[in-house]
Amino acid sequence: MTGKPSDVNQPATAGAVSKGVIFAGYLGGGTIKDCGLADFGTAEDKPPYWAHLDRSESDAQNWLVRESGLPSAALHAILAEETRPRLESFDGGGLLLILRGVNLNPGADPEDMITLRIWAEEKRVISLRRFRIMAVQDVRDQLEKGQGPSTIGGVVTQVIGGLLQRMEPTIQSLQGCGLRSCACDVTSPLSVTP
């Protein structure tokens, strides 16, 4: 790959799914070594691996269903059109996160939330999006500079941190528009009338 990578579909190595792969590679030393999905696996002798996919692309969906090895319940949740934010753990150590963030893409309304779906295991993380997620791009940029995470937990933590950081100004503006006046005092006793 030449030039600075961006959050667009990048070609994968020969024999791999190329349409729908935004980036995929091995983590190590704060960097990512691009290799596409051809070399993706769960072998213990391989370094941690991160694949970021466009979930709207049928090639990416087919790869997930046929080759990723994700449990069927996780596949159903990660590929669903309608989702809710959640965290689920699976036997064998897998973790499914479905997160929401503010849509800061050009021309978008920040109130239109974007969804990031993450499957994380000890040695690999698969993230999926439909619309560009700047928090993911930030982590990718840090990896390109050699200053990124080297572990799966580090990737997930930094992506979540980026989502939260970008949500803060929108939340602050909502608080300034009267959100505080809608809050209830959770320390006072409830009064229920039949």
Annotated model-derived regions:
Residues 1-194:
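Peripheral, non-transmembrane regulatory/ligand-interaction domains of membrane transport proteins
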